[in-house]
Amino acid sequence: MSDFDAIVVGAGPAGSCAAIVLARAGKRVALIERGPFPGSKNMYGGVIYPRILDELIPEWWLHAPIQRWITRRSTMIMTETQALNVDFRTQAWGHPPYNGATAYRPDFDHWLADVAVEAGTTLICSTTVTGLLHGANGHVSGVTTDRPDGDLTAPIVIACDGVNSFLAKQEGLYGAVDADNYTLGVKETLGLPKHVIDERFGVRGDEGVDI
């Protein structure tokens, strides 16, 4: 008998959501995170798009650690000599159902993983999945880890270990991608007083901006 019905690798939003669905279906689920806690190694920015949360966690906004609600979105298209900016604002986005929110990813990811644990998921942190196990038929049968107690088995492994998934590459599911199809992003978190943020971005209260 396998250790679990399913193993989810990566406790970011995708991994926690997958674990929530499986656990609620009565499956034995392991959610493995290589960081010391969910959100400690997050990569993408702090804007949360709530469509999936609306389906998984009714009235999630009453419990999630949200900083601001997105009421303004701004997109800029630039060339070497020109720039076009499209700016959209609406007060309707500041009320349920929300269009988006800003959050500190360590706080948000921790909260979402806790929802998965409450549903019955086993959360395993500070553990790196180093590879996949295969049964006699060649099918994936679990994962190898850097833990002293070794491997974990399950008939289903869901790789939520990021856009450059090591596990997907190992299984040949992630083909070579031309460098021209990549973009480089830089993320920096700055602390500013609330009144400074409101003044600079033209917002008030718990309104937020996605640029």
Provide a role label for each language-model segment.
Residues D3-L31:
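N-terminal Rossmann-like FAD-binding beta1-loop-alpha1 element of flavoenzymes
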Residues A25, G35-T81:
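N-terminal FAD cofactor-binding segment of flavoenzymes
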